[in-house]
Amino acid sequence: MVSAWIYFTSLMLTCANIMLQMYFTVMYSDLKDDFINPIDLSRKLNWYVLPEMGFQAFSALLLLLSGAWITFLLNVPMLAWNAKMIMSNTHMHDSTTIFKDVSSRQKRSFFKLACFAVFFFVYLFLFVSRLVDE
């Protein structure tokens, strides 16, 4: 029963990350269409950058500690990418350079959204299969 709750927790954290990535994508398109200024965009999005990375890291840690190696290994590339962004200090949005970076950040957000969607369906399948097994 513990593994089912681990997958359920990972499922909910991934759901939160999907919502955050959709919010990021909408905000980037608002900046492109000039509905929001760069200072407001940076202020709004920087508030959610570290929680998004934290949710993903906590989910991966739960999977590691529960012994779900395959699903943990599925998370390792995104963990490494997030760690690289934090170490190179490119994870936060800078209002002075956001116009230059908006298309690459939007592509990054789409990629993360796709990855989190895959994680969501994997966790959903594993959660349901663990419940059926018990």
From Swiss-Prot:
Any matching Pfam family: Cornichon
Keywords for this protein: Endoplasmic reticulum, Membrane, Transmembrane, Transmembrane helix
Gene Ontology MF, one: signaling receptor binding
Alphabetical GO biological process terms: endoplasmic reticulum to Golgi vesicle-mediated transport; intracellular protein transport
Sequence intervals crossing the membrane: 8-28, 54-74, 113-133
Subcellular localization: Endoplasmic reticulum membrane
Membrane topology: Multi-pass membrane protein
Database matches in InterPro entries: Cornichon, Cornichon_conserved
SMART domains recorded: Cornichon
Domain of life according to the entry: Eukaryota
GO CC, one annotated term: endoplasmic reticulum membrane
Family, per entry: Belongs to the cornichon family.
PANTHER family registered for this protein in UniProt: CORNICHON-RELATED
Name the UniProt record assigns to this protein: Uncharacterized protein C2C4.05
Organism, scientific name: Schizosaccharomyces pombe (strain 972 / ATCC 24843)
